[in-house]
Amino acid sequence: MASASASKYNSHSLENESIKKVSQDGVSQDVSETVPRLPGELLITEKEVIYICPFNGPIKGRVYITNYRLYLRSLETDSALILDVPLGVISRIEKMGGATSRGENSYGLDITCKDLRNLRFALKQEGHSRRDMFEILVKHAFPLAHNLPLFAFVNEEKFNVDGWTVYNPVEEYRRQGLPNHHWRISFINKCYELCETYPALLVVPYRTSDDDLRRIATFRSRNRLPVLSWIHPENKMVIMRCSQPLVGMSGKRNKDDEKYLDVIRETNKQTSKLMIYDARPSVNAVANKATGGGYESDDAYQNSELSFLDIHNIHVMRESLKKVKDIVYPNIEESHWLSSLESTHWLEHIKLVLTGAIQVADQVSSGKSSVLVHCSDGWDRTAQLTSLAMLMLDSFYRTIEGFEILVQKEWISFGHKFASRIGHGDKNHADADRSPIFLQFIDCVWQMSKQFPTAFEFNEGFLITVLDHLYSCRFGTFLFNCDSARERQKLTERTVSLWSLINSNKDKFKNPFYTKEINRVLYPVASMRHLELWVNYYIRWNPRVKQQQPNPVEQRYMELLALRDDYIKRLEELQLANSAKLADAPASTSSSSQMVPHVQTHF
């Protein structure tokens, strides 16, 4: 599978050009070998190494290290292996063996990646070969520790569409029918003074003043007060999001917060209560009181109903993914596969997230009540639940553009801590803030797409591309923890958006079986019998596991679509040429030319 991923990150128009090399005097040179490169990508060094392939044994090759990637090409005639690894994917680099190591290929480097693979290279002991490669890799894989920019800030790629324009919050809320006589758009956070990790634009109840919002924010963790994410187009029930209330051990109350939740409930006269979904296990919510947090009590919030969804915290999810990696890479133990997969608890966590989102979606769709969703700080499990519920409820988010907007809105603008959870350019691989929360969300989306194969405009390749560039640092889309930090860094001016890449070649990411349905609500089956491990993502690096290929019907359908597009294009060219001939014909023939029928296509 290594070779299959060789050109994954290549800029299509440049993938056969030679890479630039920076010599010691700073002059760019050309390297004779053809290595894929991106505009702004420079070669730092190259070395002959032995790649210790976990599947095929030692392979002699040449490794090229640029300011964006590690690229290995086999030098052996019987092996066409190529490795193409963005440096942003690297989590840890360790030296293997010492000066006294005598075993074959026992001296070199071990590289741990964030995308569930490890790389091992053996090097010669003489000439500081390992030291040089180690220092260069550490410097460019973890640029933040060396006062270097992430590659996104030197990437000079150009696309024919600007992905930064995909999401406009005013336009998105207008699509939802907002503002209206119950809800208003507030710019109280335009300078990020109310809440540093919230977007500049917030939708809040019409009856609540900005002064009220300031008082309410003081009673919510990180000032992340309840704000609107989505409104049902017919019954007008809403999905709100926030962080936990600052109740503490003494059971503190805040009349402004209590009144605010009543105002939210009263925006819809069809219901007498507000449903609060706390994503945490109840024992965790109680424990958070010791650190000043907590949950909404029945006494304080009498017109609300509280339900705990039992989704575990970031540390549990991190350990679960580590266990997944242990069973899928490099070797898979067939005889104990099911018990090994069960021991990771990964699919159980996926089930709980999906189950929670289904409850949120059903509560709103059925018109039972509006809902308020929170966890502890409201930027991890909360984002999973609101975005998945919105995906189930609103078919627009199941289009390519709609999904991009959903990610920009519920994850990026509302402050999911991408920099902390992924560790972009950071060498601290053991950081307790690292966690695969966004990966879990994408996994849930994939599970839904398997159960509803015609409901999503995008295909599996789209989801994998999003995850690959979650780590790559090629684009600015997932950099930093919140919008305030992105604005300080002028991210939209200095980097390229991932959506530019995707939207400039949408056909590559389209699901051929997609059927547009405006008002269809999706309720996936969240049982262990219907959930499965995403083989094409988690086990894609193992060549011994056959990847799930598109079925022949899908392949033939794609071929027919391409054939149709080709015929339509040729027909349009013929019609254009015919129109030009008719325009140039003498006036005397104009009457007879009107007898020529206009050809139409029935594709």
From Swiss-Prot:
Top EC group: hydrolase
SMART domains noted in UniProt: GRAM, PTPc_motif
Gene3D superfamilies: Pleckstrin-homology domain (PH domain)/Phosphotyrosine-binding domain (PTB)
Residue ranges of every copy of the Myotubularin phosphatase domain listed in the record: 163-538
UniProt keyword Transcription regulation present: no
Example GO biological process: regulation of vacuole organization
Effect of gene knockout: Mice are viable although lifespan is severely reduced. An under-representation of mutant males suggests some prenatal lethality. Generalized and progressive myopathy starts at around 4 weeks of age with amyotrophy and accumulation of central nuclei in skeletal muscle fibers, leading to death at 6-14 weeks. Mutants also show mitochondrial disorganization and increased levels of desmin with abnormal desmin intermediate filament formation and architecture.
UniProt-listed Enzyme Commission number(s): 3.1.3.95
Protein's job: Lipid phosphatase which dephosphorylates phosphatidylinositol 3-monophosphate (PI3P) and phosphatidylinositol 3,5-bisphosphate (PI(3,5)P2). Has also been shown to dephosphorylate phosphotyrosine- and phosphoserine-containing peptides. Negatively regulates EGFR degradation through regulation of EGFR trafficking from the late endosome to the lysosome. Plays a role in vacuolar formation and morphology. Regulates desmin intermediate filament assembly and architecture. Plays a role in mitochondrial morphology and positioning. Required for skeletal muscle maintenance but not for myogenesis.
Protein name in the entry: Myotubularin
Organism: Mus musculus
